[in-house]
From Swiss-Prot:
Molecular function via GO: large ribosomal subunit rRNA binding
Source domain of life: Bacteria
InterPro entries on file: Ribosomal_uL10, Ribosomal_uL10-like_sf, Ribosomal_uL10_bac, Ribosomal_uL10_bac_type
Classification via Pfam families: Ribosomal_L10 (PF00466)
Assembly description: Part of the ribosomal stalk of the 50S ribosomal subunit. The N-terminus interacts with L11 and the large rRNA to form the base of the stalk. The C-terminus forms an elongated spine to which L12 dimers bind in a sequential fashion forming a multimeric L10(L12)X complex.
Keyword Iron annotated: no
One GO process term, biological-process aspect: translation
Gene Ontology terms: cellular component: ribonucleoprotein complex; ribosome
Record's function text: Forms part of the ribosomal stalk, playing a central role in the interaction of the ribosome with GTP-bound translation factors.
Tagged with keyword Iron-sulfur: no
Name of the protein in question: Large ribosomal subunit protein uL10
Source organism (scientific name): Hahella chejuensis (strain KCTC 2396)
Keywords (A to Z) from UniProt: Ribonucleoprotein, Ribosomal protein, RNA-binding, rRNA-binding
Length: 176
């Protein structure tokens, strides 16, 4: 079924807008995946702020022009699904990596981050990135460690004085 030119332009504009706001892109081959399985994937994607699009390859190539994902143009071959991470750079990678483990017909082709295209074998690099909340928690623990150590050190001074006074008291009681 042919798509009208106006519809094609609208699809390209919509995907281009999504791509310009996205933090990362994962490209996968969905050949052989049932529609029920795809519906499950879409539901999981919505929950994790990942935008999934199935677009014709020629339209996808035009849509990524002028964005940082232009480097991924050669990966648009065969049945392709585009997964854009909107809030967390690793969200789409984690989602599709887990989905590919469950569905052996689903294959990750490539991923792109910051204008650099990475192979499917490097999906772990992106999937292992901590979420924003995890990164903030790590940063806070690193920042809190010196303060905690200082508080313990300052708390140790009165403890030492107390132990010294107790030792002097015990010594005087023994002498008396």
């Amino acid at each position: 079924m042919a798509i009208r030119l106006e519809d094609k332009k609208a699809i390209v504009a919509e995907v281009n807008e999504t791509a310009s706001k996205a933090l990362s892109l994962v490209i996968a081959d969905y050949r052989g995946v049932t529609s029920n399985k795809m519906s499950e994937l879409r539901a999981k994607a919505r929950a994790e702020s990942v935008s999934l699009r199935v677009v014709r390859n020629t339209l996808a190539r035009r849509a990524v022009e002028g964005t940082e994902y232009e480097c991924a143009r050669e990966a648009f071959v065969g049945p392709t699904i585009l997964a854009f991470s909107m809030e967390d750079p690793g969200a789409a990678a984690r989602l599709l990596k887990d989905y590919a483990k469950e569905n052996d017909k689903f294959e990750i082709k490539a991923l792109a981050v910051g204008g650099e295209m990475l192979g499917a074998d490097q999906i772990d690099r992106l999937a292992k990135l901590p979420t924003r909340d995890q990164a903030l928690a790590m940063l806070m623990s690193v920042m809190q460690a010196p303060v905690t150590k200082l508080a313990r050190t300052l708390n140790e001074i009165p403890s030492k004085v107390t132990r010294a006074v107790a030792a002097v008291r015990d010594k005087k009681q023994e002498a008396a």
